[in-house]
């Protein structure tokens, strides 16, 4: 359970429920791509909102595996890399872009219902609305980021690697994101 004030961490079952829910929304391709890029990469909502088509696609139209985010869209003002290597994310982005209007390379990757780029705030509000409609009280745009960090640690990814993937300056910040349930802690003790 999330501590007071912390965004809810989604379980694998909740993730599957969210995928099913998003597939039935008014903008399923866009909403799935938005959700999955956050859930599978741990990107902050402001960075997702700031993505341009040219950030994620090369000149030949191929989706990049490594996206180097510029400091202009990154908290802390330092460049960092995001890895778009998860097949689920890649498929969702391709599906969205195939139906997305305005494919000029200098335009925002994600557009709202009016065909305009999302602001960080409007994208946060969309995530909040989608999570609530899916029945996940306490979930917000930050739930994807916390879920990513928690899942990575629980699957055995070294916390230093998670720190790098999350673009944290301090490892203690990364530790705050990770939520450990009793089953995980039992397995941890048993493995020592």
Regions found by a protein language model. Give the residues of each.
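DNA breakage-rejoining catalytic core of tyrosine-based enzymes
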Residues: 1-16, 76-86, 103-105
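Basic, Lys/Arg- and aromatic-enriched nucleic-acid-binding interface segment
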Residues: 12-41, 45
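Short basic/aromatic active-site micro-motif
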Residues: 31, 137-155
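Active-site-proximal segment of tyrosine recombinases
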Residues: 47-49, 139, 149, 157-167
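A short, basic/aromatic helix-end/turn motif that makes direct DNA contacts
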Residues: 50-57, 163-169, 178-179
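Conserved tyrosine-mediated DNA breakage-rejoining catalytic core shared by Y-recombinases
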Residues: 50-79, 83, 88
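Catalytic-site neighborhood detector that most strongly recognizes the C-terminal catalytic loop/helix
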Residues: 69-75, 171-191
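C-terminal catalytic core of Y-nucleophile DNA break-rejoin enzymes
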Residues: 74-94, 106-128
